[in-house]
């Protein structure tokens, strides 16, 4: 008797239940060797005051199966609710998000008939973590956290993926011309790891020009690896220019768990109308089948789906009088795919996946390197005070007894405003005061506490402390513009 793989099914919100029903119908008719356990997540849970959108019972099911097929969910835009997608990815340590973008020309509309690329997006870090604060009446903050180990994991995965899938080139996208540390470490790790794969071409673009090239000449790309937020944006660009965002599926891969989902959202504006395209979730299910070693079923379904597309049987989002023969609803599309099980596409590439998945050989060192000498050399203290001139702040602080510290600069939003020959007047209630040790010796935490006490006695409202470090004698903090 064939062994059945347990799968967690999440129907999601909006069009989620409709497209999930269609996909499961196809999986059953194709005799996929899976057993299903259903969980309730998303909007219904938010309304029950689960701020994460998921219950403990659902976590237990996911932990038991290890594999999730998830339809899109709706995250309330009001405050206090966290994205379920991000929560699942981070909790299960699904560090790699794989998003293929392929043209199905001439059967779907596209300006890029030769498009065939895969975006590999870091999935746990970056601004997308959603770590945010309101610090003053006027100022809000989002934290961009990038780790050395996180960069190594995703970039190593991208090159291993290229090798296993016979890809020729890996392109890195970052913004390290501006963000020297966070995006800088991503680019540096890319350069280091690329040297270990001489058979794979490598290149780097700044994210803005890279995105422009993706939108206009996507044919030049093969594999793109990038950080979380950039990857989220460019994968939608790639999916849209391929013909429709409704066609794209994605995989979220970790060491112990995996989640498969469509790229698109829950589309509540068309929910319940029966017109949604299930192809994105179906392609995600195909990726899932390959992942669990059922390449035969994955090939069977993908070939039937491609034959359906070739035959011009299209849902509303990709229907065209020039390339379509029949406009169908969600359920009808599933039935048309099922009719073609066992058939092969005539023009589009035929799918042929192995029965046994080749696990990626991990060469990643997860240990944090602590050999660099770390030295505390200063501190940035952010204060909330509503004045028009940094000179007024400097005059007040310089009258205080702040021990062995000296006030070096005052800036706002990264622009140095003191000391300066010109007295800039700006509207701000958020200032960064940089303090350094007068004699250059190492600072102790107690010194900073004494400094904060002096500010507190002067009724200066400090809202954040960011310590300044050298690693092996190299200053590892940014300078303000003009510093």
UniProtKB/Swiss-Prot annotation:
The reaction(s) this protein catalyses: D-threo-isocitrate + NADP(+) = 2-oxoglutarate + CO2 + NADPH
E.C. designation(s): 1.1.1.42
Gene3D superfamilies: 3.30.70.1570, Isopropylmalate Dehydrogenase (3.40.718.10)
GO molecular function: isocitrate dehydrogenase (NAD+) activity; isocitrate dehydrogenase (NADP+) activity; magnesium ion binding; NAD binding
SMART domains found in the cross-reference section: Iso_dh
Name of the gene encoding the protein in the UniProt record: icd
Name recorded for this polypeptide: Isocitrate dehydrogenase [NADP]
InterPro entries in the record: IsoCit/isopropylmalate_DH_CS (IPR019818), Isocitrate_DH_bac-typ (IPR014273), Isocitrate_DH_TT1725_C (IPR040978), Isocitrate_DH_TT1725_C_sf (IPR046997), IsoPropMal-DH-like_dom (IPR024084)
Protein family per UniProt: Belongs to the isocitrate and isopropylmalate dehydrogenases family.
Cofactor: Mg(2+); Mn(2+)
SUPFAM superfamilies, per the entry: Isocitrate/Isopropylmalate dehydrogenase-like (SSF53659)
Pfam family, one: Iso_dh
GO process terms (BP): glyoxylate cycle; isocitrate metabolic process; tricarboxylic acid cycle
Binding residues annotated for D-threo-isocitrate, in chain numbering: 83, 85, 89, 99, 121
